[in-house]
Curated annotation (Swiss-Prot):
PROSITE patterns noted in UniProt: UBC_2 (PS50127)
Taxonomic path: Eukaryota, Metazoa, Ecdysozoa, Arthropoda, Hexapoda
Stated name of the protein: Protein crossbronx-like
Ranges for region Disordered: 234-266
Organism per entry: Drosophila melanogaster
InterPro entries xref list: UBQ-conjugat_E2_core, UBQ-conjugating_enzyme/RWD
Family: Belongs to the ubiquitin-conjugating enzyme family. FTS subfamily.
Length: 266
């Protein structure tokens, strides 16, 4: 007897598991300074953390969760991104700490969208908060700001009182760094644990990894490794990073002999 994969819950779950595993493999390759992994208990619940190294949010470390729809990836509903702590940003609701993805995606299309696109958007709103609230330019050349966002107070503060906004953001950055080492709120083994940098302990792992960039970074006097690693400083660099990754994925799909012929012809 033949069973439809739609009517067989077990097969549907297996297929969904493969989709989620594929998404995780893409996430590991696509972006820097932001990390996400499916929880051990449920693949629809992802743990994430972002390290912001530049811009007005520099020094911030924010934890978040990504909740995928039950029928992911077929469901057109967007994932839900929830931050663990209060984050001052026009697109983040101060009450439930959710990120508004509607300005980024209208609906989820499984053949076009991936979780790494959501992570890239999270990076973009912190790299360029002003750009994230603009819809274009007026005929006079002035920037047109959105009429409605999740946090209108943050929007008005950013648009009309930028120094005060920066002050509040920097205060939150200090708090976020203090909270990042707190005990995990869950016993899930996939929860991302962050430890303070300890040269005596971590240099041993770096030597094992034999990574030239890390060794060079840790050889700098009186500086943390993160200060010398590659950073994404603007939305332009985010676009360049995406273009590089798309090219890498495209090249990976081309058979090796065809790539060699293409390179020779160039």
């Amino acid at each position: 007897m033949w069973y439809s994969t739609v009517r067989n819950p077990s097969i549907a779950l297996i297929k969904q598991g493969y989709h989620i595993l594929a998404e995780y493999n893409l996430v590991k390759e696509e972006l820097k300074n932001i990390y996400a992994i499916p929880s051990y208990a449920c693949g629809l619940h992802w743990f994430g953390v972002i390290f912001v190294h530049s811009g007005i949010y520099a020094g911030s470390v924010f934890r978040f969760s990504i909740l995928l729809p039950e029928n992911f990836p077929a469901d057109i509903s967007l994932p839900t991104v929830v931050f663990s702590t209060e984050v001052l940003h026009p697109h983040i609701c101060p009450q439930n700490k959710t990120l508004d993805l509607a300005h980024f995606l209208n609906e989820w299309r499984k053949d076009e969208h991936h979780i790494w696109h959501v992570l890239r958007y999270i990076q973009a709103i912190f790299a360029d908060p002003e750009g994230s609230i603009c819809t274009g330019q007026s005929s006079s050349g002035d920037l047109v700001i959105m009429d409605e966002v999740r946090n209108m107070n943050a929007l008005n503060m950013l648009a009309k009182s930028r120094p005060e906004y920066i002050k509040r953001v920097q205060e939150q950055a200090i708090l976020s760094r203090n909270l990042i080492y707190d005990r995990p709120p869950t016993e899930d083994p996939h929860y991302i644990i962050v430890e303070p940098y300890c040269a005596e302990r971590h240099l041993k792992f770096m030597d094992q990894l034999k990574s030239p960039c890390w060794k060079e970074a840790t050889s700098m006097d009186c500086s943390q490794p993160s200060e010398y690693l590659g950073h994404i400083d603007s939305s332009r660099q985010l676009d360049e990073e995406e273009a590089n990754q798309v090219e890498k994925l495209h090249r990976g799909r081309i058979p090796e002999h065809q790539r060699e012929e293409s390179e020779v012809s160039l």
